[in-house]
């Protein structure tokens, strides 16, 4: 996988099954700001399993282990991107942008014409970041009833043409 050479000391690759134990804490620490709106940890190994069987994770490694990840799933001509996570001390360095580019490259290579994602309205500060990457807001949707909300919020749906 190309691209990590622009970030010396990092290596991009697709996740292996043994990465699941490292993905859970990485995602949870990156999603800590969400806990102002949603009760509990973002993910556990049980909740991670369906992601691993339905799609793939692009992971970014450094000398300390996983530095970041993003989930990509092929859904016909439209791909889905989610669970973008970068260790907090590494955020703001362009690593999320690198991960998103590789996820989009994967989806495009699989024949997807567009990529879709969603973010929680309580983290609306993420919308400009995704817009900077070429995504546009396409609408909103309700949070599933089983999501333990602390405050009212919803999903902000976004999409980007890949071809």
List the model feature ranges, each with a label.
Residues 1-6:
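Short acidic N-proximal helix/loop "leader" segments that mark the beginning
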Residues 106-109, 116:
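Long amphipathic alpha-helical scaffold regions
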Residues 8-10, 14-20, 24-89, 100-102, ...:
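Acetyl-CoA-dependent GNAT
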Residues 65, 87-101, 110, 121-128, ...:
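Conserved glycine-rich acetyl-CoA-binding loop
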Residues 49, 57-58, 113-127, 131-163:
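C-terminal "cap" of GNAT-fold acetyltransferases
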Residues 79, 93, 156:
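Glycine-centered loop/turn positions within well-structured domains
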Residues 18, 38-39, 43, 94, ...:
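Residues at secondary-structure transition points
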Residues 30-33, 58, 82, 96, ...:
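Hydrophobic alpha-helical segments
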């Amino acid at each position: 996988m190309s691209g990590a050479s622009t970030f010396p000391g990092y290596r991009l690759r697709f996740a292996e099954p043994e990465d699941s134990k490292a993905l859970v804490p990485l995602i949870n620490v990156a999603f800590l700001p969400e806990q102002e709106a949603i009760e509990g940890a973002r993910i556990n190994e049980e909740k991670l399993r369906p992601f691993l069987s339905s799609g793939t994770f692009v992971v970014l490694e450094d000398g300390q282990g996983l530095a970041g990840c993003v989930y990509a799933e092929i859904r016909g001509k439209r791909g889905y991107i989610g669970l973008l996570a970068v260790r907090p001390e590494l955020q703001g360095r362009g690593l999320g942008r690198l991960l998103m580019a590789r996820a989009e490259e994967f989806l495009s290579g699989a024949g997807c014409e567009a990529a879709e994602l969603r973010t929680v309205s309580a983290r609306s500060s993420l919308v400009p970041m995704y817009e900077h990457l070429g995504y546009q807001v396409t609408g909103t949707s309700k949070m599933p009833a089983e999501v333990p909300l602390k405050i009212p919020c919803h999903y902000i749906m976004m999409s980007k043409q890949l071809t």
